[in-house]
């Protein structure tokens, strides 16, 4: 694997949009790009995580988190450590720990961030909870358990303790503005490798 890029942030922050824009940039350079958007629908862990996210209650919260973690680990194992992978882009990664209860989330993040691969191209798209909710509601999709203003505010607050290793990009801006900031950081990172 030659290039590892990660996007994370609240639902509705524009992760998938930015994944597609940066993938397009690398594909135009003739690079092979693999995209993993967690939870992934191509394996049982991702599907079970998504099913639990569409339900409510503490048990489903725990199930969603556990299966999400297994889904992400599967992607790391199958793609990050694959010598045939050129550019690997993840939509959602370690910030899922922000959904865990206080104190537990800090401990789990420290463990996860020391075990899983990192990159200088990890982007936290920092959208306001209000803008996040507006974007979520405009999608006309089934609502997940954390897609309400109260939970979005809590989760955004919790992410502040874990984004110290990330490039924090304000995400209330237009997609093109965000994309240019992301591209500038990725290009600078690529130049270090030359």
Annotate each PLM feature.
Residues 7:
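Hydrophobic anchor at the beta1->P-loop junction of P-loop NTPases
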Residues 12:
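Walker A (P-loop) phosphate-binding loop of P-loop NTPases
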Residues 15:
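Conserved lysine of the Walker
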Residues 23, 130-194:
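NTP-dependent small-molecule kinase module
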Residues 24-33:
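Post-Walker A helix-loop "phosphate-sensing" segment adjacent to the P-loop in P-loop NTPases
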Residues 34-110:
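ATP-dependent small-molecule kinase phosphotransfer cores
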């Amino acid at each position: 694997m030659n290039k590892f890029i990660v996007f994370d942030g609240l639902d509705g922050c524009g992760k998938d949009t930015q994944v597609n824009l940066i993938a397009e940039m690398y594909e135009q350079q003739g690079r092979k790009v693999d995209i993993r958007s967690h939870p992934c629908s191509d394996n049982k862990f991702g599907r079970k995580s998504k099913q639990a996210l569409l339900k409510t209650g503490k048990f489903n919260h725990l199930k969603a988190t556990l299966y999400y973690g297994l889904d992400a680990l599967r992607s790391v194992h199958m793609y990050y450590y694959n010598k045939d992978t050129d550019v690997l882009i993840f939509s959602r990664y370690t910030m899922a720990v922000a959904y865990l209860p206080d104190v537990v989330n800090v401990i789990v993040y420290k463990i996860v961030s020391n075990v899983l691969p990192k990159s200088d191209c990890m982007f936290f798209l920092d959208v306001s909870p209000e803008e996040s909710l507006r974007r979520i509601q405009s999608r006309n999709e089934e609502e997940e358990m954390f897609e309400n203003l109260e939970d979005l505010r809590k989760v955004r607050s919790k992410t502040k303790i874990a984004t110290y290793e990330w490039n924090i990009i304000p995400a209330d801006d237009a997609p093109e503005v965000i994309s240019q900031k992301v591209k500038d950081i990725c290009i600078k990172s690529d130049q270090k490798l030359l």
